[in-house]
Amino acid sequence: MKTPIELKILDSRIGTEFPLPAYATPGSAGMDLRAITDTQLVIQPGETVLIPTGIAIHVADPSLAAIILPRSGLGHKHGIVLGNLVGLIDSDYQGPLMVSCWNRGSEPFTIEIGDRLAQLVFVPVVQAEFKLVDEFNQSDRGAGGFGHSGTK
């Protein structure tokens, strides 16, 4: 199923030097977001930087949201993760997409112009309405949390 999402190009290199975000395979859940900067960036250990992607989106449909997730190889191999862990883009947001990158590693890391640094994934949204209760119906788990079910 394909859902149209409005995308605005903010940097003229998108679509010429660098491709629009796209799914790499028919089974891909996310589209790669790239560092669309004027120069390479060096992220020092412990440093967090905000990196432009060169695009803005407007999801518009309140039953959808977009999330920005890390690329697994950057985190595992180089210690580069999202500074906010997950970026949430509400359906009514219309601004530029930025990626917060945090170098949790011990070495400086260089991001070149156009490097793929995160993934954009669209997810369904359900808006809840709270129903106030005095007690919950008993469940098997109850209030057990934070390791309650064990590791084995």
UniProtKB/Swiss-Prot annotation:
Keywords associated with the record: Hydrolase, Magnesium, Metal-binding, Nucleotide metabolism
Cofactor(s) the protein requires to work: Mg(2+)
GO biological process: dUMP biosynthetic process; dUTP catabolic process
Enzyme class: hydrolase
Substrates-to-products reaction catalysed: dUTP + H2O = dUMP + diphosphate + H(+)
Coiled-coil residues: none
Record-listed substrate binding positions: 71-73, 84, 88-90, 98
CDD domains assigned to the protein according to its UniProt record, in alphabetical order: trimeric_dUTPase
Pathway listed: Pyrimidine metabolism; dUMP biosynthesis; dUMP from dCTP (dUTP route): step 2/2
GO molecular function annotation: dUTP diphosphatase activity; magnesium ion binding
HAMAP family on file: dUTPase_bact
PANTHER family: DEOXYURIDINE 5'-TRIPHOSPHATE NUCLEOTIDOHYDROLASE
Its job: This enzyme is involved in nucleotide metabolism: it produces dUMP, the immediate precursor of thymidine nucleotides and it decreases the intracellular concentration of dUTP so that uracil cannot be incorporated into DNA.
Family: Belongs to the dUTPase family.
Name this protein carries in UniProt: Deoxyuridine 5'-triphosphate nucleotidohydrolase
